[in-house]
Amino acid sequence: YLFAPIGAYMHDIPPQVHVLSCDSLFRYLGTSQKDCSTHWRDYFIRGILACVCKLFGRKAILPLLLRSQEQLQTHYDCAISYLHNGAPHRFYGGVNEFVLKRVSAERKIAFLHCDYMQCGANCEENNAAYKGFDTIAACSRGCRSAFIRAMPELAEKCRIVPNFHQYEKIRALAAQAPYCYADGQLHVLMVARLAHEKGVDRAIRALGYVRAQGISVVLHLVGNGPKEQELRTLSHALGLDDAVLFHGDQANPYRFMRNADLLLITYYHEAA
């Protein structure tokens, strides 16, 4: 069940999987403001919801979202919320509440893909929602540790379930048209969403320092996100226009990894 049946990974869903999607207000949590830009009504409604959320918190809009969504008619063996909520004033998430309030199932599971203590998710309303699940699945040991520091009473419910990776497919993709880097320079690669928590600004400032020491290094950024223009502006201000290359969102980021000298991670927080 998808709030909005869009995104780069839609084509990866096997044909035998039955995809459902909603037409309630929850669909706006599955789209960006840019996604709505071609339909003025959707653009306006999502913008209003996001503004109210920013001013008064997600708890101010959840009753409206829930009233717009009917209870799903099918009773399931298990319902899984695969997206955690973020900070209470971010227009993000809502899947936990959807599963708890609008899905009938024998068991309900919530996945965690964040550092619960650092990303702003540790708040009264999010904590109350997690108490309603039978199991919380954390994607790593560190992710679980952060969560149970916030909610030690749920330690028995919280299990580690690592993310699934298709290693052979990844190796094959890395071998498909590997990106060729110029000789004579150190090529550093970051593959990340260009958002605050990824700390790409720190990488750019570090690059400026290293180049000032006379080291010829280029930073390659694969990904897009809300901070892209801000990061471009920072690169320009530091005189790094030729040293920071924005490759945008790539269907196959692995081909950039094949020949890179260094893979860099500068996240402020992560579910590691």
What are these regions (language model features)?
Residues 1-60:
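N-terminal strand-loop element at the rim of the active site
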